[in-house]
């Protein structure tokens, strides 16, 4: 049976969370934290800056923000949801990258434990693993549908007790494809009684899928499930760097004990509070515009002579298309030349992804505004035709 304490590193199990006087006393004459009581050194601060009390350390717990995130996610719960979330299920980080790194540090002993990924996938998993001296194992996604290979994953983790984390990106990056929810449920249930490890589902692009696709509302049912989210994509708030980890209350306690006490700034939380309440309608409008433009852009790209197939799916705010050479074959050489010419000659920056597994000739294109997309399509066709003359 799964036991979270069996995979937490021994030094984390005995960790005493950082506490400060402000945890117990929040009002009055506050002379406990060596802050500058005169205020922020900002010329003529505006009302917002004054209200945020930027000379004070931010709230280390962010309970109001956590509850708003929960309220938002529980509007469209996963169809398998049986239990409500609480603020004890959440840990906030400086972007999802902090959450990725924190999970590695929480459960993987450097030089001993391993992490399993399913390429093609997000590159930060491997970077964080390497930094933490954690061995990387791989089970590729199936092709051409970019779904998880359940038998291969089960075989891998059951045969190697040192694998402590399985990272899945859903919707995928660079694939743009949602992993079948039932497939992940199958893994969770199959491994719950025979594997001491965590299945981490990174849902950075989840708001571009059908409502109810998120697995975040299932973490109380599956103690071996962790879900990562961000406000960077659908909410258009990449600049505030806010990542959200949903997990069991027990695991969340350890993650919150590990994190730096004031990791979420007052500026970040102020913006996030507005976005996850008053900004929901705006976010949904943005998502609608992006998905509409995504379909238009993809249709036009696929009509071009030297563009092959849509390599990935349509569950994100980007497309991944296959660039062909003049013989009609997928070509990394042509894709790289197109990428470089667009960037240096036309000031249009896309992303070369042809080096990723099963993505030969791949260019990943984020969906911009209608005007940006028109310019992209014009220059993409012209430059690609010139290359293949």
Swiss-Prot record:
It comes from Candida maltosa (Yeast). Keywords: Amino-acid biosynthesis, Aminotransferase, Histidine biosynthesis, Pyridoxal phosphate, Transferase. Its cofactor is pyridoxal 5'-phosphate. GO terms for molecular function: histidinol-phosphate transaminase activity; pyridoxal phosphate binding. Its EC number is 2.6.1.9. GO terms for biological process: L-histidine biosynthetic process. The keyword Transcription does not apply. It is an enzyme of class 2 (transferase). It holds the Pfam family Aminotran_1_2. The modification N6-(pyridoxal phosphate)lysine is found at residue 233. Pathway: Amino-acid biosynthesis; L-histidine biosynthesis; L-histidine from 5-phospho-alpha-D-ribose 1-diphosphate: step 7/9. It comes from the Eukaryota. It catalyses: L-histidinol phosphate + 2-oxoglutarate = 3-(imidazol-4-yl)-2-oxopropyl phosphate + L-glutamate. The keyword Amino-acid biosynthesis applies. This is Histidinol-phosphate aminotransferase. Belongs to the class-II pyridoxal-phosphate-dependent aminotransferase family. SUPFAM superfamilies: PLP-dependent transferases.
């Amino acid at each position: 049976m799964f036991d979270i304490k069996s995979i937490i590193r021994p030094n984390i199990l005995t960790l005493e969370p950082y506490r400060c006087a402000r945890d117990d006393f929040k009002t009055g004459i506050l002379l406990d934290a060596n802050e500058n009581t005169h205020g922020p050194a900002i010329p003529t601060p505006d009302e917002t800056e004054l209200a945020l009390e930027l000379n004070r350390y931010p709230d280390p717990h962010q309970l109001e923000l956590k509850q708003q995130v929960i309220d938002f996610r529980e509007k469209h719960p996963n169809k398998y949801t049986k239990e409500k979330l609480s603020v004890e299920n959440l840990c906030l980080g400086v972007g999802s990258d902090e959450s990725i790194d924190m999970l590695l540090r929480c459960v993987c002993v450097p030089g001993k434990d391993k992490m399993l990924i399913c390429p093609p996938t997000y590159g930060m998993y491997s970077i964080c693993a390497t930094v933490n001296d954690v061995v990387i194992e791989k089970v590729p996604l199936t092709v051409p549908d970019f779904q998880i290979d359940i038998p291969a994953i089960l075989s891998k983790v059951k045969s190697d007790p040192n694998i402590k984390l399985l990272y899945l990106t859903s919707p995928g990056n660079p694939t743009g494809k949602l992993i079948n929810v039932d497939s992940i449920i199958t893994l969770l249930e199959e491994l719950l009684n025979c594997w001491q490890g965590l299945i981490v589902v990174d849902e950075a692009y989840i708001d571009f899928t059908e409502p109810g696709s998120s697995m975040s509302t299932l973490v109380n049912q599956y103690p071996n499930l962790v879900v990562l989210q961000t406000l960077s994509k659908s909410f258009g708030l990449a600049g505030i760097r806010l990542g959200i980890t949903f997990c069991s209350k027990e695991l969340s306690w350890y993650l919150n004990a590990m994190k730096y006490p004031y990791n979420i700034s007052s500026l970040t939380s102020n913006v996030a509070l507005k976005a996850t309440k008053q900004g929901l309608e705006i976010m949904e409008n943005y998502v609608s515009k992006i998905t509409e433009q995504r379909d238009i852009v993809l249709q036009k790209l696929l009509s071009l002579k030297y563009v092959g197939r849509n390599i990935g799916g349509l569950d994100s705010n980007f497309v991944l298309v296959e660039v062909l050479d003049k013989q009609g074959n997928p070509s990394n050489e042509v894709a790289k030349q197109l990428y470089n010419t667009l960037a240096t000659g036309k000031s249009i920056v896309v992303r070369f992804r042809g080096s990723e597994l099963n993505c030969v000739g791949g260019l990943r294109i984020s969906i911009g505004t209608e005007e940006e997309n028109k310019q992209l399509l014009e220059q993409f066709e012209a430059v690609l035709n010139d290359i293949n003359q």
